[in-house]
């Protein structure tokens, strides 16, 4: 038996709503042009985790990220650490790279990204040239300003190294998304919800009339 027109509309509305909700709940999204959006942290990573092609000291790494222009955006920076986690610690997921390492890549303490090089981890495979090594963060280590924070993707540790003597990689990131979210999305979802509610009420009234006959 064919569905009634009202039921078809309701089914379509539910399907569209579910699709939009799934999109909104996505974590890592390939935006193209070498950029990956993290909807949980609301930041956009460079897809190429070694775009510079070389290790640098901290100041050169900062300058490199600041000079980048990718996808018409020029507000790139190095990732943020989390000083509250502390020095030489694992499982620091508030650290932006730590969140990517532990939450998105699903790695554990001491495991390292090299375990994913030839695997089928969908999140990890969105990126290229991820190094199993040390990446500078964009902040000084306050107790010793000759040092700066870093994150080691070989072990999953957050720590700090000498700004001048330490030669590590840089992985640029920027705040926010690189694609504007349609302003009508929320209104559309709300409207579809009202449509479903109206359909349910209408069917309820029809059943009540039939029961009264």
Language-model-detected regions and their locations in the chain:
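Sec/Tat signal peptide C-region and signal peptidase I cleavage site
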Residues: 20-26
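An exposed tryptophan-centered "aromatic clamp" motif
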Residues: 62, 66-73, 81-150
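C-terminal membrane-anchoring or membrane-association module
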Residues: 198-213
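Bacterial N-terminal signal peptides that target proteins for export
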Residues: 2-11
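Bacterial N-terminal signal peptides
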Residues: 11-19
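Short, structured beta-strand segments at or near domain termini in extracellular proteins/domains
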Residues: 162-180
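Extracellular adhesion/carbohydrate-recognition regions
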Residues: 27-77, 167-173
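A short, hydrophobic C-terminal helix/tail in secreted or cell-surface proteins
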Residues: 182-201
């Amino acid at each position: 038996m064919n569905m009634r027109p009202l039921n078809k509309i309701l089914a379509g509305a539910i399907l569209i709503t579910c699709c939009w909700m799934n999109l909104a709940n996505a974590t890592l999204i390939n935006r193209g042009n070498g950029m990956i959006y993290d909807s949980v942290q609301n930041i956009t990573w460079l897809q190429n985790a070694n775009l510079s092609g070389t290790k640098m000291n901290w100041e050169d790494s900062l300058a490199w990220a600041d000079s980048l222009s990718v996808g018409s955006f020029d507000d790139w920076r190095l990732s943020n650490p989390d000083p509250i986690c502390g020095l030489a610690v694992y499982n620091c997921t508030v650290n932006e790279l730590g969140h990517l390492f532990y939450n998105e890549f699903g790695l554990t303490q001491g495991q390292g990204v090299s375990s994913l090089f030839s695997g089928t981890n969908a999140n990890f495979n969105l990126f290229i040239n991820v190094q199993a090594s040390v990446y500078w963060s964009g902040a000084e280590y306050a107790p010793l300003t000759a040092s700066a924070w870093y994150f080691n993707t070989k072990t999953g540790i957050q720590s700090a190294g000498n700004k001048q003597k330490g030669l590590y990689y840089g992985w640029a990131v920027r705040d926010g998304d690189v694609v504007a979210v349609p302003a009508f999305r929320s209104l559309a979802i709300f409207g579809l919800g009202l449509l479903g509610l109206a359909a349910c009420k209408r069917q309820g009234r029809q059943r009540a009339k039939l029961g009264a006959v």
